[in-house]
Structure formats: structure tokens, C-alpha cells
């Protein structure tokens, strides 16, 4: 399931474009997640009041959390699959404190893919999309494995 060097290069190349505007990308990813999958809002106590796209657009807290999410994911992606030290604490908090189901990681992966495709269509062709999809799947699978270690079936 690992990625080739070329695939990692594609992932990190497009990720560089994401990092050029973490706040904008992160905000859009979370808005997309909550709009496409409203049930995910139940896991975020401080965002439960955000019911409309306008409320979400105006939320500085949502924007800040988007930066946090994409910053953490970026740290993991940059490890090119050797992400145990970055992944373990993230999995622990998501399994034991936040109780985020693996399915929700799939949902946010979809949102990430959609936002990148919308914002960077010219740079996110079929090969880059396939590589990113594979990298996000590796992340989710490894999170799911860690969840089990922490006793969370997610």
C-alpha cells in the first residue's frame, strides 16, 4: 500500500500549494465536511451552532481549526509513510478524547480532495489525485490501526 518516490513527490508538490494558504484551504475543507456530512458537526462542540454556510464562513474558530487540521496532516504527509511519531498522539486524542470514527476520516479525506481539485485544477491531474488519494488512504488505515491499539473500534 506504500507510495512510490514519484507518488510522494506528487503528493508533496500539491501539498506545497495547500500550505501557501492553510487558513483558506483548511476553512474550505471543514466547511465542505460539515455541509456534505452534517452529522460530523456533532463531534465538534464549539461548532455545533454553525448551521449555515454564512455562519461557517464567518467563524474564526473554524478557520483556526482548519489550519490545525491541515498543519497536522502536512507533518504526517511529509514523513512519506514513516509517520509513527506524528500519527500516534493524533490517533490517541482522536480515539480516546474526541472519539472520531474512521468513517469521518474518510469524509474529511473526500473534502480535502474536492477542495484541492477546485483550487488547483491545473496542478491536480489524474496522477496527482491518485497519489493523494493513496496517501490519505495510508493515513486513514494507519489511524484505524492505532485506534485499535487504544481500544477504540471507531
From Swiss-Prot:
One of its GO terms (biological process) is removal of superoxide radicals. One of its GO terms (molecular function) is metal ion binding. O2 binds at residue 65. Gene3D superfamilies: 6.10.140.2100, 6.10.140.2110. It is found in: Cytoplasm, Sarcoplasm. GO terms for cellular component: extracellular exosome; sarcoplasm. It catalyses: Fe(III)-heme b-[protein] + nitric oxide + H2O = Fe(II)-heme b-[protein] + nitrite + 2 H(+); H2O2 + AH2 = A + 2 H2O. Residues 2-148 form the Globin domain. It comes from the Eukaryota. Nitrite binds at residue 65. Keywords: Cytoplasm, Heme, Iron, Metal-binding, Muscle protein, Oxidoreductase, Oxygen transport, Transport. InterPro entries: Globin (IPR000971), Globin-like_sf (IPR009050), Myoglobin (IPR002335). Its EC number is 1.7.-.-, 1.11.1.-. It holds the Pfam family Globin. Heme b binds at residue 94. Monomeric heme protein which primary function is to store oxygen and facilitate its diffusion within muscle tissues. Reversibly binds oxygen through a pentacoordinated heme iron and enables its timely and efficient release as needed during periods of heightened demand. Depending on the oxidative conditions of tissues and cells, and in addition to its ability to bind oxygen, it also has a nitrite reductase activity whereby it regulates the production of bioactive nitric oxide. Belongs to the globin family. Monomeric. This is Myoglobin. The gene is MB.
Amino acid at each position: 500500500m506504500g507510495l512510490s518516490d514519484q507518488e510522494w513527490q506528487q503528493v508533496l508538490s500539491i501539498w506545497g500549494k495547500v500550505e501557501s494558504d492553510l487558513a483558506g484551504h483548511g476553512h474550505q475543507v471543514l466547511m465542505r465536511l460539515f455541509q456534505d456530512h452534517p452529522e460530523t458537526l456533532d463531534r465538534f462542540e464549539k461548532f455545533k451552532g454553525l448551521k449555515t454556510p454564512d455562519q461557517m464562513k464567518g467563524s474564526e474558530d473554524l478557520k483556526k481549526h482548519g489550519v490545525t487540521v491541515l498543519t497536522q496532516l502536512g507533518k504526517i504527509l511529509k514523513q512519506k509513510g514513516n509517520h509513527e511519531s506524528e500519527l500516534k498522539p493524533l490517533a490517541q486524542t482522536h480515539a480516546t478524547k474526541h472519539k472520531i470514527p474512521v468513517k469521518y476520516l474518510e469524509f474529511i479525506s473526500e473534502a480535502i480532495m474536492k477542495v484541492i481539485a477546485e483550487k488547483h485544477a491545473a496542478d491536480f491531474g489524474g496522477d496527482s489525485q491518485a497519489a493523494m488519494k493513496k496517501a490519505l488512504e495510508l493515513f486513514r488505515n494507519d489511524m484505524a490501526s492505532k485506534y485499535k491499539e487504544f481500544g477504540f473500534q471507531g
